[in-house]
Design a protein with these regions (language model features):
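Extended, low-hydrophobicity, polar/charged segments
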Residues: 1-153
Length: 153
């Protein structure tokens, strides 16, 4: 199960106790915010994009939107979300639970500047009924991010 992969990954960083398993869906920003009792912007949504033959992940604030010119300037390609049937095989997590923890090898993770507006954010934890309460600094460390980018508006 993907939540087990996320838990094992977070354990390496001493953060596995932060996972919240929910009894309701957290598959969208709105559902996650309601389930976790926070404002939607604090949901650290994980977006999966095509990049060459593989994929990249970008975590952004729940209310942020991809800015196509910024994305192309940063990554050298047009922003194209992964097709639904490619997400789990490429990333290692199913849609609704995609997170930066325990992803398949070779998938770079980037954090968008929109997250810096918050002290605490809530990414998913590998399935569509989970979340993790992390400071932005903990998220940066635990996601093993390749870096910070500015690709949202």
């Amino acid at each position: 199960m993907s939540i087990d992969k996320a838990r094992a990954h977070l354990k390496k960083h001493g953060l596995e106790d932060r996972i919240m398993e929910l009894t309701v869906s957290s598959a969208t920003v709105a559902l996650a915010a309601e389930a976790l009792g926070c404002e939607p912007a604090r949901i650290a949504k994980t977006l999966s994009f095509e990049h060459g033959d593989g994929a990249i992940l970008v975590l952004a604030a729940g209310d942020a939107r991809i800015d196509n010119p910024k994305f192309k300037a940063q990554f050298g390609v047009k922003a194209r979300m992964l097709a639904a049937d490619r997400v789990e095989p490429l990333i290692g997590h199913a849609i609704g639970g995609v997170c930066p923890f325990g992803v398949n090898p070779g998938i770079p993770v980037y954090l968008d500047e929109s997250l810096r507006a918050f002290d605490v954010v809530y990414p998913a934890a590998g399935n569509s009924a989970s979340g993790v309460r992390l400071t932005v600094e903990e998220l940066e460390r635990a996601s093993e991010a390749a870096g910070w980018v500015d690709v949202c508006k």
